[in-house]
Structures are given as structure tokens and as C-alpha cells.
Amino acid sequence: MASLSHILVLWVGILTVVNAEAPQEHDPFTYDYQSLRIGGLIIAGILFILGILIVLSRRCRCKFNQQQSLGKMRSPHLAAQFSSESC
């Protein structure tokens, strides 16, 4: 009987070791945050440099005329109303 109990204990031990060494299934909800962080920093750096290049290029393709200043846009009638002649 002692040999049968030894065989059962040995068999249970072998089964435990075999189950422990079984390859783990890939968990789809495990993320690699280090790669995600590095990728985000690279994209942020590229967008930052692109923004600086756009600002420094001084090319704005806007629809309004950029050559008009605030002084030229004033009406001459408004300037006449506030002249010193009315005092």
C-alpha cells in the first residue's frame, strides 16, 4: 500500500508541474504602456516641430487681405466727428 500512495503523490506532483509549465494564453487586454508612451512622445514631437515650421514659414493662405491695417479700415467720417474743430 505504501508504494501505491507514493505513486499517487508522484503522479499528482508530475501533473502539477506539467500544468504550471503550460504556455499561457495571450491576454488581449494586456497593453505595452512603454511602447505606447514612446509612440505618443514621437508623434507629439513631430507635431510640435511641424507647428513651429508653419509659424516660421510666414505663409498663411487665409481668405482675408492681410495688408489692411486697423488705421486704414477706419471711416473718415468717424475721424471728423472727433476732431478739435467741434470744441
Swiss-Prot record:
Gene Ontology biological process terms in this record: negative regulation of protein glutathionylation; positive regulation of sodium ion export across plasma membrane; potassium ion transport; sodium ion transport
MF term (GO), any: transmembrane transporter binding
Keyword Iron-sulfur tagged: no
One GO cellular component term noted in the UniProt record for this chain: intercalated disc
Signal peptide: 1-20
Subcellular location(s) of the protein: Cell membrane, Sarcolemma; Apical cell membrane; Membrane, Caveola; Cell membrane, Sarcolemma, T-tubule
Record PTM S-glutathionyl cysteine, positions in chain: 62
InterPro entries registered for this protein in UniProt: FXYD_motif, Ion-transport_regulator_FXYD, PLM
Residue list for modification Phosphoserine: 75, 83
Modifications made to the protein after synthesis: Major plasma membrane substrate for cAMP-dependent protein kinase (PKA) and protein kinase C (PKC) in several different tissues. Phosphorylated in response to insulin and adrenergic stimulation. Phosphorylation at Ser-83 stimulates sodium/potassium-transporting ATPase activity while the unphosphorylated form inhibits sodium/potassium-transporting ATPase activity. Phosphorylation increases tetramerization, decreases binding to ATP1A1 and reduces inhibition of ATP1A1 activity. Phosphorylation at Ser-75 leads to greatly reduced interaction with ATP1A1, ATP1A2 and ATP1A3. Palmitoylation increases half-life and stability and is enhanced upon phosphorylation at Ser-83 by PKA.
PANTHER family (UniProt xref): PHOSPHOLEMMAN, SODIUM/POTASSIUM-TRANSPORTING ATPASE SUBUNIT GAMMA
Subunit architecture: Homotetramer. Monomer. Regulatory subunit of the sodium/potassium-transporting ATPase (NKA) which is composed of a catalytic alpha subunit, a non-catalytic beta subunit and an additional regulatory subunit. The monomeric form associates with NKA while the oligomeric form does not. Interacts with the catalytic alpha-1 subunit ATP1A1. Also interacts with the catalytic alpha-2 and alpha-3 subunits ATP1A2 and ATP1A3. Very little interaction with ATP1A1, ATP1A2 or ATP1A3 when phosphorylated at Ser-83. Interacts with the non-catalytic beta-1 subunit ATP1B1.
Functional summary from the UniProt entry: Associates with and regulates the activity of the sodium/potassium-transporting ATPase (NKA) which transports Na(+) out of the cell and K(+) into the cell. Inhibits NKA activity in its unphosphorylated state and stimulates activity when phosphorylated. Reduces glutathionylation of the NKA beta-1 subunit ATP1B1, thus reversing glutathionylation-mediated inhibition of ATP1B1. Contributes to female sexual development by maintaining the excitability of neurons which secrete gonadotropin-releasing hormone.
Annotated domain remarks: The cytoplasmic domain is sufficient to regulate sodium/potassium-transporting ATPase activity.
Descriptive protein name: Phospholemman
